[in-house]
């Protein structure tokens, strides 16, 4: 198959074709340097300017105030599960977690290694298909931060509201939803996101952190590579940053502006998700486990009423150029991820295939 396919994978996800073509054209000789972007030193004026431009573009998109730091860190977003409690918890503090899916469960268990974490809600017994009722929780007096995952990539669950914390810093894993919908940065103490959904390719983690959270470092001293304050003071250049990822991210930020900004993409994302859910709800052949009020816009989880047909389904979808529809190994079933770069044409092609498969096998 020579033509581009529709990649419904949860990550790495589709990137806009125009960005890939730009990167291809610039790959051997970036900005007339005679070098590839992969070869240029990270402390050269060109790369320092690239990082500065990327940060400024992200600040404009999200309206990030000056009292927040933007960090471009190498590695998986999962590292933040440990970095957050290490940086934000003092002796005697505790962290409160909403456990609404696999990723928040993992984050809680990582924080609990310090024996300083508790959960406000745990939706695992119900199968991670719903969100806790609004404001039905109580924080301990020694709570240093509240942690939640607005969009659970694996389980397809989305918070329809931002938890109120009474002034306690709110920490959010926005790996699969940052830049897909408008947010108010001032509601958060810290936001982080892996890049491989809506930002760039895998290997970059973006952290947005309020300056107040950098002022009180817990004892003992945090290792330098895991210290937010250290990375902020060095403007993401304490160690070699993932330059190529930042390069693609910078292009993505500018692309988002051409799409009507985050608000424009959010409207499009809502339409894409609504169209797919509407079809899935119209037939008994496909099952959707998540309660309607908690459905994700980015990650639509579903299954077949005849599970033994799943391998056939995936094979035929793959032959049609509909890739990576298999659900996560921890959740099973099927999943269609509709990130920013997924066009409506991809959703239409998927619905057409779903309809045909149901008619032929129902």
Swiss-Prot record:
Its EC number is 2.6.1.52. Its cofactor is pyridoxal 5'-phosphate. One of its GO terms (cellular component) is cytoplasm. Coiled coil: none annotated. L-glutamate binds at residue 43. Pyridoxal 5'-phosphate binds at residues 77-78, 103, 153, 173, 196. The modification N6-(pyridoxal phosphate)lysine is found at residue 197. GO terms for biological process: L-serine biosynthetic process; pyridoxine biosynthetic process. Binds 1 pyridoxal phosphate per subunit. The keyword Transferase applies. The keyword Amino-acid biosynthesis applies. PROSITE patterns: AA_TRANSFER_CLASS_5. One of its GO terms (molecular function) is O-phospho-L-serine:2-oxoglutarate aminotransferase activity. It catalyses: O-phospho-L-serine + 2-oxoglutarate = 3-phosphooxypyruvate + L-glutamate; 4-(phosphooxy)-L-threonine + 2-oxoglutarate = (R)-3-hydroxy-2-oxo-4-phosphooxybutanoate + L-glutamate. It comes from the Bacteria. Pathway: Amino-acid biosynthesis; L-serine biosynthesis; L-serine from 3-phospho-D-glycerate: step 2/3; Cofactor biosynthesis; pyridoxine 5'-phosphate biosynthesis; pyridoxine 5'-phosphate from D-erythrose 4-phosphate: step 3/5. It is an enzyme of class 2 (transferase). Keywords: Amino-acid biosynthesis, Aminotransferase, Cytoplasm, Pyridoxal phosphate, Pyridoxine biosynthesis, Serine biosynthesis, Transferase. It is found in: Cytoplasm. Catalyzes the reversible conversion of 3-phosphohydroxypyruvate to phosphoserine and of 3-hydroxy-2-oxo-4-phosphonooxybutanoate to phosphohydroxythreonine. Belongs to the class-V pyridoxal-phosphate-dependent aminotransferase family. SerC subfamily. Homodimer. This is Phosphoserine aminotransferase. The gene is serC.
